[in-house]
Amino acid sequence: MDYQTIPSQGLSGEICVPGDKSISHRAVLLAAIAEGQTQVDGFLMGADNLAMVSALQQMGASIQVIEDENILVVEGVGMTGLQAPSEALDCGNSGTAIRLLSGLLAGQPFNTVLTGDSSLQRRPMKRIIDPLTLMGAKIDSTGNVPPLKIYGNPRLTGIHYQLPMASAQVKSCLLLAGLYARGKTCITEPAPSRDHTERLLKHFHYTLQKDKQSICVSGGGKLKANDISIPGDISSAAFFIVAATITPGSAIRLCRVGVNPTRLGVINLLKMMGADIEVTHYTEKNEEPTADITVRHARLKGIDIPPDQVPLTIDEFPVLLIAAAVAQGKTVLRDGAELRVKETDRIAAMVDGLQKLGIAAESLPDGVIIQGGTLEGGEVNSYDDHRIAMAFAVAGTLAKGPVRIRNCDNVKTSFPNFVELANEVGMNVKGVRGRGGF
C-alpha cells in the first residue's frame, strides 16, 4: 500500500496515540517471567509487539490478547519456567524483539533460533553477540546478522561492560542476561539512552543499582507480577507534533503521552527551533511520567543539533528532518550513524525523499545537512520503513502539491491506526493501491 497526501488547511482536535512500543515490548517480556498474573493496559497491538507476544507464547507463557481493548493478561511462568520452542522464533521486523530475546535466552537451559524478515536479517547483531559471549553465551550467526542460533547456558557470569555507543537495546539485552548470571552485571553507557527496562525492573520489584552512567543487576532474583498501564508513544506523537508545528492554523492536543526524560529529544530540539509546545497535566504511573502535549503552529529556524540530544531523539529524526526542511536556515545533524542501521538507512532515505520534494539535503557519514526551503509535491519511497513513511506523510501537510509515499505497509509494525488518526486531526492522508500516479 502507498500513502497519498494533499496539503492540509491546519490540524485541530485532541487525540490519544497508541501505547508506547518500547514499553510494550519490555512489559510483556518481564510479565512473562514474573510470578503471578499481570494485566497490561494500553499495549501496542502493532506487528512488532505481537511478534514478541508470539515468541513468548511459543515458550510456554500464557498471554491472553484482548486486541480491541489493547489489553494483555499475562500468567507469568517465573524466572525458570520458559520452555524450548518447537521451531525458530520469528521476530518479524523488530530489532528490539530480537535483541531483548537474545538477552533473555542466553541464560536458558535450551537452545533457540531467532530470525526475522529480510530487513531484520540485515541488521547488525555483533553489538550484542560480543558482550553476551563475554558472559559465557554461545551464539552462532553468519556475518553477525540474523538468524541467530543461541545455545542456552544457565551458568552465565556477570560482567562490567562499557557500551561503545548509547543503545537502549544493547543495554536492555545485557540486563536481561544479567538476571540469569552469577554475580553482578554492570553496564556503563557513554550517554543516557531510554531507561524503560530499568524502570520496569523496579516496577516488577527487582532490585537494581543505578548511578548517572551505570546500571547494575545481580542474578538470582525474582520478578513479581504487577499490573501496568502503558502511556502513549512519544515516537508516534512526534508525527503530529511536527505536523501541527509546521502547518499554519494548527492547534492540537495529544493526551497521556509518555514524557520519559530519556525520550524528550524531539521536544527539546523543536523548542530550540522555535516550536510552540506546552506540556501539561504531568503525572507519574508505573514508574513512567505522562502528560498532555499541546502544539500550535510556529515558524522554525534551523539549528546545529547538540550531540547529547541525538540518543534521546534517535527514532524521531525522520520526522524532525521534515521540520528542518521547512525551517529558516540550515540544520546540521552529526553523531547519528546509528540511523544508517535501522529498518533502512534512514539518512539515505530521508535525503533521497527530501531532494525529490525540492529540498537541498546533503548526506554526511553520520548525519545530514538540510537547508530549509519549500516542499514541493512529488513521489518518494519509504524503503519499507514505517517511520520514513509517516515522516513524508507529515511533509504532505505543507507541500505545495500532493505527495505519494511508496510502500507503506510497514506502518502496521508501530502505528496501525496512523491514517485514521491523521485524518481525524486534518492531515489528509489516504492509503492507495496500485502504481498509478497523481
UniProtKB/Swiss-Prot annotation:
Q: What is this protein called?
A: 3-phosphoshikimate 1-carboxyvinyltransferase
Annotated organism of origin: Coxiella burnetii (strain CbuG_Q212)
- Give the UniProt entry's GO cellular component terms: cytoplasm
Positions with a binding annotation for phosphoenolpyruvate: K21, G95, R123, Q169, R346, R387
Q: What is its EC number?
A: 2.5.1.19
Q: Molecular function (GO) terms listed?
A: 3-phosphoshikimate 1-carboxyvinyltransferase activity
Active-site annotation: D315 (proton acceptor)
Keywords of this protein's UniProt record, alphabetized? Answer: Amino-acid biosynthesis, Aromatic amino acid biosynthesis, Cytoplasm, Transferase
Binding of 3-phosphoshikimate occurs at: K21, S22, R26, S167, Q169, D315, K342
Q: Which domain of life is it from?
A: Bacteria
The entry assigns this protein to a family as follows:
Belongs to the EPSP synthase family.
